[in-house]
Amino acid sequence: MKKHIVELIMGCLLLICFYYLSREAAAVSVEMNQKQVIVVDCGHGGMDPGMIGIDGLKEKDVNLAIGLKVKSALEKKDFQVVMTRETDVGLYDEDSNNKKVQDMQKRIFLIQEVKPVLAVSIHQNSYEDSGVKGPQVFYYRDSVKGEELAEIIQEKMNDYLEVERPRQAKG
């Protein structure tokens, strides 16, 4: 039950984040007068379950459920959304010697090929220290705008959740 509440909170947080992201991207879209593309990457999938909770809940399933909701919310805001996956599949060939590496390479290639205004990768992190709580936003360290946006999102999520020991955005 507690795990599902955490999932619900994380889903709500992502929707809040996308609200702020969509406002920024909408301003750019108006200037360019065209539909902006956002890539939503639902982490893990296929043979890679990601973290597995005490109750057997797999990170890949949570990521996909959140990603599909994010896609729907963004499309309602008139964005074109490209998903790395919309079902429980990995982005690797079955005969690949290193499925994890190939999966990551294909995700990167997709983002480079699409050239989105924004790419978001959804994951659920776990930590050995049970005192560590709250969301953490990651950004491409060489992107000044990405860092600024990540810090805004991090601050909004920490405020919304009233996190006692808030994390910092990380590049």
Identify the meaning behind each predicted range:
Residues 36-56:
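Short glycine-rich His-centered loop
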Residues 12-16:
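Bacterial N-terminal signal peptides
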Residues 2-9, 19-33, 64-171:
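Active-site-proximal helix/loop segments of hydrolytic enzymes
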